[in-house]
Amino acid sequence: MHPTPLILSSSLLLVIIILIYPVLTSLNPNPQNPKWATSHVKTAVSSAFLISLLPLAVFLDQGTETIVTNWHWMNTTMFDINISFKFDYYSLVFTPIALYVTWSILEFASWYMHADPYVNRFFKYLLTFLIAMITLVTANNMFQLFIGWEGVGIMSFLLIGWWYGRADANTAALQAWIYNRVGDIGLIMSMAWLAMNLNSWEIQQIFFLSKDFDMTLPLMGLILAATGKSAQFGLHPWLPAAMEGPTPVSALLHSSTMVVAGIFLLIRLHAIMENNQLALTTCLCLGALTSLFTAACALTQNDIKKIVAFSTSSQLGLMMVTIGLNQPQLAFLHICTHAFFKAMLFLCSGSIIHSLNDEQDIRKMGGLQNLLPFTSTCLTIGSLALTGTPFLAGFFSKDAIIEAMNTSYLNAWALTLTLIATSFTAVYSFRVVFFVSMGTPRFLPLSPINENNPAVINPIKRLAWGSIIAGLIITSNLLPSKSPVMTMPPTLKMAALMVTAIGLFTAMELATLTSKQYKTNPITQTHHFSNMLGFFPSVVHRLMKKLNLTLGQLAATQMVDQTWFEAAGPKGASSTQIKMAKITSDTQRGMIKTYLTIFLLTTALATRLATI
């Protein structure tokens, strides 16, 4: 066997084994060491990250990809299911990034969750979550991908509902689970179609055999699956609701794991989509609508975690637009750069929330650049990277995506919406920085502000370096897998930067207007629409349920109580008794006085006649 594929396969299988080992040790019936979370889980993830750099280096040097099939799970006459790993461009680049980000999040969680009595179980859940995501990324067939897909789904349910004593956390966990179930219907139906028509779930065979079939139906199922998992418009409300979970969960969920799983599914299977115009147009329009709607919702939110959550959904919409433009490698590049600064934004938010006695309202913050200088600086860096500031990580992916949009002849409506959403990104990002870092403190004076802890500083510092240089490193070392779009005039090339600058100025104007009151009732309809999330949760979660409840009450009262129960109960008994009484009364008319009078008169007459 050639040494290069051997190095790739053995290294990445070793990574998976190292990650599984702490989970297996937790099955030991003996009581665990209180330090198990940091000694086993964090060490395992950091070691796995270092090992995963070896196959990445080999791939960058040799350009070699490999597939490992090492176990036949099930064989029938027409159908085989194998355990098969695909170590290609996507899995070799994504795995180290996921491990690096998770390592930082786990270290931060050791500080954030130190007082939780079940911290070891929490770390085990986070590790299982990561294993499920790596299983999904490295899968070479739909069955194995489905295992990873369901794994991240069930672990997200357990982690979002971690504080299960709170009704909101339970509701959010159920909401995430139910919305993902809707998406899972699409994936299961697509897998059933592939099994019936192509007789294979192996990805290479699907690519080869799909040329002879119209793939519109399974592609719609895959897009539905991605809509549920990656929180696209229509199935998006679970994403902001998931903020009820602990902040490390939000960071892991929104950066490099669950929410990008749907986009990754479409990237992995893009070969069967690239010539299907209906599927591409669906992705383009769905992504544009998601990006604009969620960015508009983020403009007026006051919960710092909700704003970052809506920004995630907006960026996922941008990735979906990129897939619709037939540029999956740009969507993957944005996944990679987005992981660093989004995880860092959540960790900075967690540090601020912890320091302000669990306060999440940005209107009650302010002046933190003096009290939490490191966290505030990293929050600003992350926000700048998110808006696509030149030479930070987000610039290399967002600029390439906007350039591809500007040179595209596709749907101008969708591309215009996406550009507007990009400008909104600058508005809400700068709004967060303004309210959190600038101005004077608006929080209680007795807040236990302290960021001088290595478990806080080190993970945020690592992610800050990633947010600054990751885009440059990835674009410098990895050649595009598809031919890039052609160049454009400098004026058009500057369009992305101009849109971001306009967004920043708009944010400054909005921030200064916040302290000025021009109307007695300043809340406008547009503000209300944005603040109420477009009335989407109210309509979906309340309107239909209220109609069903009203219909049920009418059926229960009018049909059951007033009809069947009345007929079988009091009214039924009375009608039966009335009939019997009528039959009885026909034989005896009830004129007793008349009868007695006639009887007495007859008796008197008879007596009189007898005496004569």
Swiss-Prot record:
Location of this chain's protein in the cell: Mitochondrion inner membrane
UniProt topology in membrane: Multi-pass membrane protein
Enzyme type, top EC level: translocase
Catalytic function, reaction form: a ubiquinone + NADH + 5 H(+)(in) = a ubiquinol + NAD(+) + 4 H(+)(out)
Assigned EC number: 7.1.1.2
Gene Ontology, cellular component aspect: mitochondrial inner membrane
Disulfide bond found in the keyword field: no
GO BP field: ATP synthesis coupled electron transport; electron transport coupled proton transport
Keywords, in A-Z order: Electron transport, Membrane, Mitochondrion, Mitochondrion inner membrane, NAD, Respiratory chain, Translocase, Transmembrane, Transmembrane helix, Transport, Ubiquinone
Membrane-spanning intervals of the chain: 4-24, 40-60, 92-112, 122-142, 145-165, 176-196, 216-238, 247-267, 278-298, 307-327, 330-350, 376-396, 410-430, 454-474, 494-514, 589-611
First-listed, main subcellular location of the protein, grouped into a coarse class: mitochondrion
GO MF annotations in UniProt: NADH dehydrogenase (ubiquinone) activity
Chain's role: Core subunit of the mitochondrial membrane respiratory chain NADH dehydrogenase (Complex I) that is believed to belong to the minimal assembly required for catalysis. Complex I functions in the transfer of electrons from NADH to the respiratory chain. The immediate electron acceptor for the enzyme is believed to be ubiquinone.
Similarity section: Belongs to the complex I subunit 5 family.
Protein name: NADH-ubiquinone oxidoreductase chain 5
